[in-house]
Amino acid sequence: MRWSESVYSLRSTLKPLFQPDSPLTLRKRNKSLCEYNIRRSRRRPEEESIQSLSKHVSTTTQPCPTDGRMMFDLSNPYHSSETVVGRDAEGPANPLDTPFSEFCFSQLVSNSAHSYLDFDLFDEPTPGTNQAQTIEPGQQTSGFENPIPYHTHRNDTPILDWSKLDRYQSLHQHSAAQFYDSLGTEQDDSAARCTLALFSGRIVADKAETNPFLIHKTHRTTVLLQNAHVGGRRQQAVLDKCYTGLGYTSLGSVRTKAR
């Protein structure tokens, strides 16, 4: 049996809410075991900046252009892709910064679904109370496919913008609408379909690990995902968010194993 491993790094804003009550089950094939290292920054929010956040990552690339593409560092022997979500001083925010991406990432690190109204988003209006819908596992939503790379609703369905590597190692952006427990997407450039299922109820959060040589605490969180698409590649969608107003950052990696 041969295993292929792809490593992605992500950065996202989230609230460090961890509930270790839910068991992690590995019963089906074609699932990915992902680990996130969640860190809380001790700097004051007003002192934080996008540039200072990149200093927390040891091996980084240049910030991604404003058209939504990102650059990767392939020097790692494990083909690690260190992603830096950047923002030019005069350019717009990364189009992957959406309320729904915040919501999905909060499901990855917490058992309960949270509202995303308390997150300020670059160049985006804060959704009203009639738009902020807490999507519980198993809840049905309608609507599908939205190639516009920013927050939108279709039939009261939040749309997630995400990215995927092609065979030329170029990152392309795609969109998805949530159906039940999964995210269904259809690629813009081909007829291939991709399904990414978020098992928000199957999350294990370990206790906080304190390193006396570090200035922050690290929370290790394990989450079960399902990721399958044509071409034999199992790539985890990158949910990127880079905002320092709350003083929280997430610096970690997603390790995807496929058989």
Swiss-Prot record:
Q: Which GO terms describe its molecular function?
A: dioxygenase activity; metal ion binding
Q: In which pathway does it act?
A: Mycotoxin biosynthesis
- Kindly summarize what the UniProt induction comment says about this protein's expression: Expression is up-regulated more than 10 fold in toxin producing cultures.
- The region called Disordered is annotated at 39-66
Compositional bias, Polar residues, is annotated for 50-64
UniProtKB keywords: Dioxygenase, Iron, Metal-binding, Oxidoreductase, Virulence
- Report if keyword Metal-binding is assigned: yes
User: Any miscellaneous information on file?
Assistant: Gene clusters encoding host-selective toxins (HSTs) are localized on conditionally dispensable chromosomes (CDCs), also called supernumerary chromosomes, where they are present in multiple copies. The CDCs are not essential for saprophytic growth but controls host-selective pathogenicity.
Its biological function? Answer: Part of the gene clusters that mediate the biosynthesis of AM-toxins, host-selective toxins (HSTs) causing Alternaria blotch on apple, a worldwide distributed disease. AM-toxins are cyclic depsipeptides containing the 3 residues 2-hydroxy-isovaleric acid (2-HIV), dehydroalanine, L-alanine which are common for all 3 AM-toxins I to III. The fourth precursor is L-alpha-amino-methoxyphenyl-valeric acid (L-Amv) for AM-toxin I, L-alpha-amino-phenyl-valeric acid (L-Apv) for AM-toxin II, and L-alpha-amino-hydroxyphenyl-valeric acid (L-Ahv) for AM-toxin III.
State the name under which the record lists this protein. Answer: AM-toxin biosynthesis protein 11
Its source organism is Alternaria alternata
